[in-house]
């Protein structure tokens, strides 16, 4: 496929033929194995049914990160408004290692300066406290869905998973199959609806904001389990509204 990069997107001939000025998207075509995705997708459907029946706890695991510079999301604003959000200095990041329970819709997050195997093990220890077997208490088997990323398949991580094999089973996702991981959408919700358009002084402030955002997200999803997340509201003016996205502003 060849995509024209010409900037002449106002050409009348193209408008007459219903052309639109659009940006191409990346595709995972050629990197995915269709049969494997279908097979694992069917297995996960069965796992969801088991979780909904109360037979197991199903968790979708993944990693993401947040920046001290503002995450920019689309908002309602007056048409033509030039939205700017201060973004001073060099951006620093905080890694988020999380697991989503699709039945209770609760997100569990461990924050760290890095995304390493030791950080993944720290998140497993977090799951130990929540779902691991405890003396005198019944415990459900836990199924953790993960991709084959290096921090999950390292020697340290595999040893940590093996030590929990009596109560935790891993469902490995196929290569390049983010559409099978339910937590992917929740990362977007967390950033776009709870962390957007904010500038953080340092990583400590960002870390605190992440945990507050997770608490707010979990409360919202528990109170309104069928409601879609709210759009962040940055309103300017009173009429001629349009959905737009702010830009970072590095001026004084």
Segments and roles (model prediction):
Residues 2-90, 232-240, 244-252:
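Charge-mixed, compositionally biased segments that are often intrinsically disordered regulatory tracts
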Residues 9, 54-56, 183-252:
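C-terminal anion-handling pockets and recognition modules
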Residues 10, 62, 98-99, 105, ...:
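Generic structural signal for small/hydrophobic residues in well-ordered secondary structure
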Residues 55-57, 69-70, 75-139:
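Electropositive, glycine- and tryptophan-enriched low-complexity nucleic-acid-binding patches
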Residues 59-61, 142-148, 171-174, 227:
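Short beta-strand segments
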Residues 63-67, 101-105, 114, 149-152, ...:
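Short, solvent-exposed loop/turn segments at secondary-structure junctions
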Residues 82-89, 162-185, 198-199:
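RNase H-like polynucleotidyl transferase catalytic core
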Residues 124, 136-153, 176, 181:
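Acidic/histidine-rich, metal-coordinating catalytic segments
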